[in-house]
């Protein structure tokens, strides 16, 4: 049996908890995210509307993989598949380790290229550019479509109004084989941008500031929709930068609207691309202009954040954390010397970024002792930058060019940070050790600030190149409200009933076992020392389950128990054993305040079911506030009625403690669980 991952609408006692609604109890309009998912969901009843919290089977418009294409291909072939379901749906790009000329890497690249040619898949070789940039340039990611990729920065596509979201390799193999995978529609947060961005501030400053001022997981595992009158004045490149870093903000997507600015962008793309182009042409752009889609007036959002753009100024992330952001005004006064500067990545190495940096650096030289690295997002971007002279201006200043690709951003190739060094980068992540040594310090900033810092030899702004101080920064004007309504359910009330497949239980119940901690990571669930012991028996997996969290866990728990834990359960690595070890203990359900996204996908993919119920963990924390035990048998019993989308919790004497509606678990997801997980489901589809 397995665990499934459902969520509830609940009061938010901890910022960042999922607040989801069930379509079976709410009759309302849809937001833009839900409308796009509706378009790409398959197997729905004719009158079925999808909402946050629902599990759906999706058939995305396109699926991109990069250097991980060969592991995906290996998994695909391991499923017994021989031909991809739809070669027009799949895109392969080589972008991460393009500087690596080792025999092993070249062999992998050769295998990917050959596989793509054999299958008729669109393939872009090393040097053509970063996959996400190619997806946008070539129109695979397109406004109002659903595009996925086996990469965490798939959120980028939201900048052009495409619902982009990441998947794991098993999902990608499923799409290759069947055209489909599953998705749970996240809670949707509306981020309203008001006012106009002041001179000197950029799209990068918006997202860096957002990551810093809302840094308590407010949008963790949410889909974001950017709205407000401030959006219309943001260029598409600014939108792409913002959407790209919604990943670091913790979101699963970052969607901008289709508006006049975006339509004008595509009018220009039509002029630039060879015509007739299969995806970006006069007809597709005309259709986009005439058939804009917006959220319904009565759409529901889990959160509503408001930021006044006019109160922003240049901001910098770090060191070594995107949750720490400091104004350029404050940081420039600290005289932080730098060793390396980077204008690379899918975040900020488009043409406008390179031109902005060139405008700052032209006529100057990179400071002595500083190495400045530049790589275009794609070969097309580099050609355009060369054509306008911006590329040469940067090279003449002393920058070192790298091939179009990810490179230093992912910690690969030339120019990585060494022990004790300080770097400033226009990339998206500055986690400790990501861009080189764990003993280095990494900051993130806009292309303009990176270029100025490279010349100054310290973190500073363009104003300082003219001998002027960085202007003072105002306090950022912002607010956040949460939809804190709780669905209190009358157990006798009638409601729509969910069909249950043969082999799937109509209800799941057991005693709640409290593991009272937030951020229990995959190593806490399944110790890393066992991860690569492929021959470890199931009984041993059951024995070591949760031992790094609590060595007494195995003595205190039994088959059929239900783990309940705090927020962000299963954060950390992608190891699938974190899910399968729980199954090995014959536990049918895990409940938490929230889950790590990769863990939640691995749960379903391995036939493990989970529920998010923030209100329940909050109640248990109140009850056991004085306890020091890591694992507690609560004497509370949970029953999940799958047919009614409803959870009830009672004590040992039968007293009702909580009744809660949850998202709908349809027959599509039930089928995956009955088949033993996504791989079993794919094999069954291939047989049929």
Swiss-Prot record:
Positions of [4Fe-4S] cluster binding: 346, 406, 409
Record PROSITE patterns: ACONITASE_1, ACONITASE_2
The entry's keywords: Amino-acid biosynthesis, Iron, Iron-sulfur, Lyase, Lysine biosynthesis, Metal-binding, Mitochondrion, Transit peptide
Reactions performed catalytically: (2R,3S)-homoisocitrate = cis-homoaconitate + H2O
UniProt cross-references to Pfam families, sorted A to Z: Aconitase (PF00330), Aconitase_C (PF00694)
Any one biological process term the GO annotation gives: lysine biosynthetic process via aminoadipic acid
Gene Ontology molecular function: any one: homoaconitate hydratase activity
Coarse class of the protein's main subcellular location: mitochondrion
A GO-annotated cellular component: mitochondrial matrix
EC identifiers of the protein: 4.2.1.36
Annotated localization: Mitochondrion
Cofactor(s) named in the record: [4Fe-4S] cluster
InterPro entries hit by this protein: Acnase/IPM_dHydase_lsu_aba_1/3 (IPR015931), Acoase/IPM_deHydtase_lsu_aba (IPR001030), Aconitase/3IPM_dehydase_swvl (IPR015928), Aconitase_4Fe-4S_BS (IPR018136), Aconitase_4Fe-4S_dom (IPR036008), AconitaseA/IPMdHydase_ssu_swvl (IPR000573), Homoaconitase_mito (IPR004418), Homoaconitase_swivel (IPR039386)
Listed Gene3D superfamilies: Aconitase, domain 3 (3.30.499.10), Aconitase, domain 4 (3.20.19.10)
The record's free-text note on cofactor binding: Binds 1 [4Fe-4S] cluster per subunit.
CDD domains per the UniProt record, alphabetical: Homoaconitase, Homoaconitase_Swivel
Pathway(s) per entry: Amino-acid biosynthesis; L-lysine biosynthesis via AAA pathway; L-alpha-aminoadipate from 2-oxoglutarate: step 3/5
Transit peptide: 1-19
Family (UniProt): Belongs to the aconitase/IPM isomerase family.
Function text: Catalyzes the reversible hydration of cis-homoaconitate to (2R,3S)-homoisocitrate, a step in the alpha-aminoadipate pathway for lysine biosynthesis.
NCBIfam families to which the protein is assigned, alphabetical: h_aconitase
Protein name: Homoaconitase, mitochondrial
Organism: Debaryomyces hansenii (strain ATCC 36239 / CBS 767 / BCRC 21394 / JCM 1990 / NBRC 0083 / IGC 2968) (Yeast)
Lineage per the UniProt record: Eukaryota, Fungi, Dikarya, Ascomycota, Saccharomycotina
Underlying gene: LYS4
């Amino acid at each position: 049996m397995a665990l499934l991952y459902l969520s509830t609408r609940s009061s938010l006692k901890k910022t960042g908890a999922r607040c989801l609604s069930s379509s079976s109890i709410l009759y309302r309009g849809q937001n833009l995210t839900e409308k796009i998912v509706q378009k790409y969901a398959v197997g729905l009843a004719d009158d079925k509307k999808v909402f946050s919290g629902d599990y759906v089977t999706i058939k995305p418009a396109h699926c991109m993989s990069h250097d991980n294409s060969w592991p995906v291909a290996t998994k695909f072939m391991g499923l017994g598949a021989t031909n991809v379901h739809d070669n027009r749906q799949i895109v392969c790009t080589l972008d991460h380790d393009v500087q690596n000329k080792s025999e092993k890497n070249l062999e992998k690249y050769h295998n990917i290229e050959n596989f793509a040619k054999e299958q008729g898949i669109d393939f872009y070789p090393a040097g053509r550019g970063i996959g996400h940039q190619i997806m946008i340039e070539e129109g695979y990611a397109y406004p109002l479509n659903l595009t996925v990729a086996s990469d965490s920065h798939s959120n980028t596509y939201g900048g052009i109004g495409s619902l982009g979201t990441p998947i794991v390799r098993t999902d990608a193999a499923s799409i290759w084989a069947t055209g489909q995978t599953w998705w749970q529609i996240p809670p949707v947060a509306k981020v309203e941008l008001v006012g106009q961005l002041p001179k000197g501030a950029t799209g990068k400053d918006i997202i860096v500031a957002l990551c810093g001022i809302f840094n308590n997981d407010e949008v963790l595992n949410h889909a974001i929709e950017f709205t407000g009158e401030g959006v219309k004045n943001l260029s598409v490149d600014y939108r792409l930068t913002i959407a790209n870093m919604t990943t670091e903000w913790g979101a699963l997507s970052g969607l901008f609207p289709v508006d006049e600015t975006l339509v004008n962008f595509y009018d220009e793309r039509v002029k630039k691309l060879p015509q007739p182009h299969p995806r970006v042409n006069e007809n597709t752009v005309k259709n986009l202009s005439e058939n804009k889609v917006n959220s319904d007036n009565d759409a529901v959002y889990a959160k509503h954040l408001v930021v006044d753009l006019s109160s922003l100024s240049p901001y910098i992330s770090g060191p070594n954390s995107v949750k720490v952001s400091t104004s350029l005004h404050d940081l420039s006064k600290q005289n932080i010397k730098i060793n390396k500067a980077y204008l690379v990545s899918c975040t900020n190495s488009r043409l406008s970024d390179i031109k902005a940096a060139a405008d700052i650096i032209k006529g100057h030289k990179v400071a002595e002792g500083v190495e400045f690295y530049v790589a275009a997002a794609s070969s097309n971007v580099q050609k355009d930058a060369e054509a306008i002279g911006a590329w040469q201006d940067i090279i003449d200043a002393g920058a070192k060019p790298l091939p179009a690709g990810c490179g230093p951003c992912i910690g690969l190739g030339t120019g990585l940070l060494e022990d004790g060094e300080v770097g400033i980068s226009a990339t998206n992540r500055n986690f400790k050790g990501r861009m080189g040594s764990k003993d280095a310090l990494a900051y993130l900033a806009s292309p303009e600030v990176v270029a100025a810092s490279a010349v100054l030899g310290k973190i500073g702004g363009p104003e300082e190149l003219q001998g002027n101080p960085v202007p003072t920064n105002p306090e950022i004007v912002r607010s956040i409200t949460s939809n804190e309504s709780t669905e209190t359910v009358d157990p006798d009330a009638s409601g729509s009933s969910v069909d249950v497949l043969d082999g799937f239980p109509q209800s799941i119940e057991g005693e709640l076992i409290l593991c009272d901690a937030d951020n229990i990571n995959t190593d806490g669930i399944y110790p890393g020392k066992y991860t690569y012991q492929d021959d470890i028996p199931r009984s041993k997996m059951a024995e070591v389950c949760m031992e790094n969290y609590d060595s007494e866990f195995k003595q205190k728990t039994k088959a059929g128990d239900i783990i309940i834990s705090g927020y962000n359960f299963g954060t950390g690595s992608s190891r699938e054993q974190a899910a399968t070890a729980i199954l090995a203990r014959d536990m049918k359900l895990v409940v938490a305040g929230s889950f790590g996204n990769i863990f939640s996908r691995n749960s379903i993919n391995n036939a493990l079911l989970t529920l998010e119920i923030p209100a329940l963990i909050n109640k248990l924390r109140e009850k056991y506030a004085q306890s020091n035990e890591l694992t507690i048998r609560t004497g509370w019993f949970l029953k999940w009625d799958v047919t009614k989308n409803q959870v009830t919790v009672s004590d040992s004497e039968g007293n009702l403690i909580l009744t809660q509606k949850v998202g709908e678990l349809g027959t599509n997801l039930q089928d995956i669980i009955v088949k033993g997980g996504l791989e079993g489901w794919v094999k069954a589809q291939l047989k049929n």
